[in-house]
Amino acid sequence: MKKVLAMSILTMIVMSMGGCGASSDSSSSQDVSSKAETESNSPYTVEADFSKGASNDFSISAGWSNGDPFNCSWSEDNVTFNDGKMQLTIDSMGDSEAYRGGEYRSKENYGYGLYEVSMKAIKNDGVVSSFFTYTGPSEDNPWDEIDVEVLGKDTTKVQFNYYTNGVGKHEYMYDL
C-alpha cells in the first residue's frame, strides 16, 4: 500500500485541546522555503522549488473540511507563492467552520523511505505546522498516517503520531 505524501506543509491542523484554540490575531501566516519539483540524481528524490510558484506535481486543497475536532476548511486563497517562498495562512471564517487554512499536497504516491522538509513553524496557540504521509478512504485505502507536527503553543517541541487502520492516539512529544 502506498502512502500519499500529503506534503502539507500545513499551517494548521488546528488541534489545541479539542479545537482551533483562541488567538489574539484573526489571521496568522507561515512562510515555507524548500527546494522542490525537480528530480535529482536519485530516481526516488523529488524536490520543490517555490521560486517557480505552484507546481503541477502538487495540488492546493480547497472546498472541504477536516471536521471535528479541528473545525477548519481548506481554501486555495490561503496558499500563495511570493519571493521564492510558499505562504500558508489561517484566518477566521464566521460560517460553519471556525477557521480556513492552506494545504499543499503532492499528487503522487510515495512508498516508505526518507522524507525531509524545510519549514518555519508558526508560533501561535491553536495552530500546527506539520508534514505528514497519508492514505485513507479518499484513496480507497484504510486510514494510515504518519504525522510530524510542531504545535504553535510551544515551537521548541515536535509531536509525532501515527494511525494504522484509522486508530491513532500514539502521540510522542520530543524536545528540540
Spell out what each predicted region is.
Residues 21-24:
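Bacterial signal peptide processing site
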Residues 11-12, 127:
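Repetitive helical segments and hydrophobic/amphipathic motifs
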Residues 2-10:
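Sec-dependent signal peptide recognition
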Residues 35-176:
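GH16 jelly-roll
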Residues 26-38:
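Ser/Thr-rich, Pro/Gly/Ala-heavy low-complexity intrinsically disordered linkers and tails
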Residues 16-19:
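C-terminal motif of bacterial Sec signal peptides marking the signal peptidase cleavage site
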